[in-house]
Amino acid sequence: MNFDRTFLTFLGVIMLVHLHIFFAFLSLALLVIRGAMQLNGKNWRSIKLLKILPHLSDTLLIVSGVVILYLFAFGIEWWLVAKFALLILYIVFAAKFFSKKVSQPKSIFFWLACVSFIGAMLIAYLK
């Protein structure tokens, strides 16, 4: 019976890690889709799914990351600090690019948001 519980826990952790990876790629894809639309002058805000799904995906990405962090009991390691810093940069750059207050968004903020996000993904992959 103990083996079954351990095996199920292991499967749950593996599923959580795969969900985290899925949400990372989904968040990146949604960033690129909204960014491309914004750069081409398309109103992505008129598409309800593109207004809601990025927030949901990013939230589930962060929550799954925190749960993984708790389950694996990571200390404060360099790669974790770097991922957190890149996550903050991604949020700042994306917020500047997608701000409603700016009539003509600067594409550099979009590219910096993409680089920050991909950098965080690469750190996770290469650590």
From Swiss-Prot:
Superkingdom assignment: Bacteria
Cellular compartments annotated: Cell inner membrane
UniProt keyword Oxidoreductase present: no
Keyword annotations of the record: Cell inner membrane, Cell membrane, Membrane, Transmembrane, Transmembrane helix
Membrane topology: Multi-pass membrane protein
Family: Belongs to the SirB2 family.
InterPro entries noted in UniProt: SirB (IPR007360)
A Pfam family per the record: SirB
Chief location category: membrane
Name this polypeptide is given: Protein HI_1253
Transmembrane segments: 13-33, 61-81, 82-102, 107-127
UniProt xrefs under PANTHER family: PROTEIN YCHQ
Keyword Ligase belongs to the record: no
One GO cellular component term: plasma membrane
